Amino acid sequence: MKNIAKLKKIKGDASFREFYRNKDKNSIYVISKKEKIKNLLIYDAINKILIKNKILAPKLISENYLNNYIEIQYFGDQTLYEIIKNKKNNKFKTFKKIVKILNKMQLIQDKKIKNFKNKFYKVHEYKNKILFDEAKLFCDWYVPKMLPKVKIIKFRKKFKSEIKNLLSTLNYKNDTFVHRDFHVSNLMYQNKKIAVIDSQDALIGNKAYDLASLIDDVRLKTSNKLKEKVFKFYIKTNKKIELNKFKRDFELLSILRNLKIIGIFMRLALRDNK
């Protein structure tokens, strides 16, 4: 890697990764000293699966796992978040393009691929235990700041019981490729093409999850009318879906995801000073 001082640092996300742009090669260095298996090895493996299935994702240019970094393809600095946020009219047209990419992603059958260490990585299942632990972040980090101590124990017990009951009512099986963070800030726009980034957390899970991530995105304010149009377009392009069952899963997973996000944001503030 070049002298890091000569590289342009790019604004990161909520993770412990750092990103530096190499203008000479139009690439990005992803540096990860913590969770490097997920942030480097698994990230590359998932990108390979996406690319294999003709979905635009960062190609690996070089790697130095020993020194905690990989170099990947750069898709510019324009996200679909910025495009949609600044668009006064016809936001739905952009969302239709995104839904088509989601549909393509949900057709992925590959669950195993070799990473850059030439070892097979298998995409794991998005089990209810993971969904439960994610929702529990709300209880662990947000609730203690909002309730007096005497009420926390009772609330936690009731909360956990309710979440477990709700999870048991999910209709759709875990049989679909799930990005797990599929929203407009993780979709890059370059040369009239959309690229998918930040896919290291992908699992095989419920078909409704990524649509819930996209439509009920806490970072992007959209009207209920637009949300409904995007949902209906997805249903229209997925004829085999049982609407009532799917909508119930969509609503439940959206609630669970947003409980997780509230917990994560509070943890970032309290534990990580971000």
Task: Annotate each PLM feature.
Residues 241-251:
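Acidic, serine/threonine- and proline-rich low-complexity regulatory regions
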Residues 4-21:
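ATP-binding glycine-rich phosphate-binding loop
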Residues 20-133, 171:
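ATP-binding pocket architecture of kinase catalytic cores
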Residues 10-14, 62-65, 250-254:
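A short beta-turn/loop motif at secondary-structure boundaries
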